[in-house]
Amino acid sequence: STLDPLKLAYDFHIEAKYLVEKNSAKFADIFTTVSNITAFEAECLLKRKVDAVLPNGIDLSKFPTFEEIATQHRKNRNLILEFLLYFFSPYLTRSCPVRNSLIFFLSGRKEIRNKGFDVALLALGKLNQILKEKNININIYVFIFVPDEIIDINHNTMDNLITYKGLENYLDELRDEIKSRLLHSLIHQRPISGEKLLNQDEILEIQKILGKIKKEKQIPLSTHIMKSDNEFFQLFNQAGLLNKEEDKVKVIFYPIYLSSTDGFLNLNYYEAINGSHLGIFPSLYEPWGYTPLETLAAGVMAITTDLTGFASYIEEKKLLTKETPGIWIIKRKNKSDEEVIQELTEVLFKITTMERSERIQNKYEARRLASHFDWKELVKNYINLYES
């Protein structure tokens, strides 16, 4: 390497941290890293070759089993679709198309360049244009789960969620009565109409509840009020992802930590990703990369790049199958942003237009891949190295 790590450490005023790390590596009995990427960095910057590369793992007991994947996905997906219905329907002149749809997500720390959020959103913008031009009857909803500075919650959105919940509760109260009316109509072979199922007072009450729905000038891009110069809003504008009614790809910026009591999705992170169809992680730099691994463990397809330690390990061990890989590894090493965006767009289009049966096969392959990274298995690497 032509780098002078010590000089750079002083230039960036991190000499104390650097010297501690360098000497820790120098005098350690066993020196390891989690990936080939960090092993190369260690040799260049800390001047010691690693004794072994020990990949990171996860506790698979926290994730659904093969048998549970379909049931939990359906449950969590339906909760997400319900949120999407409440979020978008006040602004659409046609019915909100949530049933014939796919749920994608991006997540991670707010490192827009490193995490690849920029190329991901630009590729999604291209996908939006392609789906519109080809008039493909599918809708993509993309959540951006990235904690960020907020001004306030979007009160209109929150009030609408409360209103729709009120309507749902009212219909629950009427359920037995509506069931009885429907049953009588069927038994007596009478024509079924709205008037037969709901009386005038009930219709008026429903109209009263719906009258509380609030609208803004355009469909919101986020669950929260953000600063006007927010970097994600700038990227949405650049990518043409503005949540117009005709858009096939719509975005929901979710700038808070997911929680079962956050007031919007009311799901924790693992539940939210389990209810999705695809996680998108086109990182520019990732020593390991837990987010795609967690996504696979949840039984969900993922996209990552060859600049992550996780993808490097998968390729080195030849764990992928060509037909249903479960995860797609985009070439990002020595590639321009334009080349990355093009390949990512092609992969997104391929996944979007998959048959349902093929998506299901990829889901199970994703979960199978994750089984290689259970700590129950990987801990043996540490024990063997220690005993040697």
List the model feature ranges, each with a label.
Residues 1-388:
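Catalytic cores of nucleotide-sugar-dependent glycosyltransferases that transfer UDP/GDP/TDP-activated
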